[in-house]
């Protein structure tokens, strides 16, 4: 159970219809990124389309239809490479987008399977009691960080 208290919803806000939809991830190689997210994380390809000299796709987690990753790949100039992180502390010093988070039911099982699939584990699982979560961080081959979060019992 989460210890984070969510304030009451503001249904009267002019922005009440806003809901999260996707996070865009820029990669240099569209086909390789799509393949990585499908093969390593079991994401499903929802839709693909071209835009100028780039290729884009919405990818959804294996059993979640409410959150997408939008892959933006190819095109010129290519994206500026992200640095390789040795640990989470290194990454927290950079401005801008940091990571996206995926909830998991069993952190140990998830990390074991990611390790079996040769996914880079950036930070081993650790507990953060102040938010009632057990967290870990992994990275795709292009340095995009993915947080994994399990609610502490």
Describe the predicted segments one by one:
Residues 72-77, 150-153:
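Acetyl-CoA-dependent GNAT
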Residues 15-17, 25-70, 74, 116:
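Core segments of cupin and vicinal oxygen chelate
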Residues 24, 44-51, 123-129, 150-153:
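Conserved catalytic-core motifs of GNAT/GCN5-like acyltransferases
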Residues 2-32, 52, 97-104, 150-153:
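N-terminal beta-strand motif that seeds the catalytic metal site of vicinal oxygen chelate
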Residues 19, 55, 65-67, 93-98, ...:
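Residues that flank catalytic or metal-binding motifs in active/ligand-binding sites
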């Amino acid at each position: 159970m989460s210890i984070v208290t969510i304030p009451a919803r503001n249904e009267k806000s002019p922005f009440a219809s806003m809901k999260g939809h996707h996070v865009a991830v820029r990669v240099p190689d569209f086909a390789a990124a799509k393949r990585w997210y499908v093969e390593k994380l079991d994401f499903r390809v929802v839709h693909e389309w071209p835009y100028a000299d780039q290729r884009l796709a919405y990818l959804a987690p294996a059993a979640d239809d409410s959150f997408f990753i939008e892959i933006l790949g190819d095109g010129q100039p290519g994206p500026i490479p992200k640095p390789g992180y040795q640990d989470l502390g290194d990454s927290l010093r950079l401005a801008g987008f940091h990571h996206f988070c995926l909830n998991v039911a069993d952190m140990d099982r998830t990390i074991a399977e990611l390790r079996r699939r040769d996914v880079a584990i950036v930070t081993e699982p650790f507990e953060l009691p102040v938010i009632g979560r057990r967290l870990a961080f992994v990275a795709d081959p292009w340095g995009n960080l993915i947080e994994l979060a399990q609610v502490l019992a």
